[in-house]
Amino acid sequence: MRELTKRQSEIYNYIKQVVQTKGYPPSVREIGEAVGLASSFTVHGHLSRLEEKGYIEGDPTKPRAIEIVSDQTNDNINMEETIHVPVIGKVTAGVPITAVENIEEYFPLPEHLTSTHNSDIFILNVVGDSMIEAGILDGDKVIVRSQTIAENGDIIVAMTEEDEATVKRFYKEKNRYRLQPENSTMEPIYLDNVAVIGKVIGLYREM
């Protein structure tokens, strides 16, 4: 492989370090902060040079899609397989949840955090503390499997009457549905009809 400049070595070593500790690569912003580069354009330039020199491989259509190229100098890196899961920024009635217009970004998840077909998985960023007693905190990412049915007690993502996604525990009662927050200070939501979007199957939290 071709020799790296000092800055390229800093970036390359930082990427390796993050992959070793987290199992997935850092974002361009994180790389810039780590090596003291304010411009994402400059970081992209260094990443392009690293790719040209055969140290990394990238996918320009996906953020964080950086792979360390295995060779004699780094074949001891323990890279966990990752999948790039769509992060849903909004949910629109009548539009498939993973429609392009709903996707804010793609987030790399260690593959062991999912247990189903990757195409059925999406992520929602949790806002608020309505599920704190279930261990779901503000700022967490919930891993969701797309489905339109649920069983009593499931933690689901549902569409509210205001066309917003909400994470609650699902209960079907005699003549209505109850969406129960896991926060003893909050009241349940009662609905005549409920649009189930998916079931929460996992949680990701950055420490």
UniProtKB/Swiss-Prot annotation:
Residue ranges flagged as DNA-binding region: 28-48
Keywords: Autocatalytic cleavage, DNA damage, DNA repair, DNA replication, DNA-binding, Hydrolase, Repressor, SOS response, Transcription, Transcription regulation
Reaction(s) catalysed by this chain's protein: Hydrolysis of Ala-|-Gly bond in repressor LexA
CDD domains noted in UniProt: HTH_ARSR, S24_LexA-like
GO molecular function: DNA binding; serine-type endopeptidase activity
Site, as annotated: Cleavage: A93, G94
EC code(s) of this entry: 3.4.21.88
Active-site residue numbers: S130, K168
Cystines in this chain: none
Keyword flag Transcription regulation: yes
Biological process per Gene Ontology, one example term: DNA repair
Enzyme class, first EC level, given as a word: hydrolase
Domain of life the protein comes from: Bacteria
Keyword NAD: no
UniProt cross-references to InterPro entries, sorted A to Z: ArsR-like_HTH, LexA, LexA-like, LexA/Signal_pep-like_sf, LexA_DNA-bd_dom, LexA_repressor, Peptidase_S24_LexA, Peptidase_S24_S26A/B/C
NCBIfam families: lexA (TIGR00498)
Subunit record text: Homodimer.
Similarity remark: Belongs to the peptidase S24 family.
Functional note: Represses a number of genes involved in the response to DNA damage (SOS response), including recA and lexA. In the presence of single-stranded DNA, RecA interacts with LexA causing an autocatalytic cleavage which disrupts the DNA-binding part of LexA, leading to derepression of the SOS regulon and eventually DNA repair.
Protein name: LexA repressor
Organism whose genome encodes this protein: Staphylococcus aureus (strain Newman)
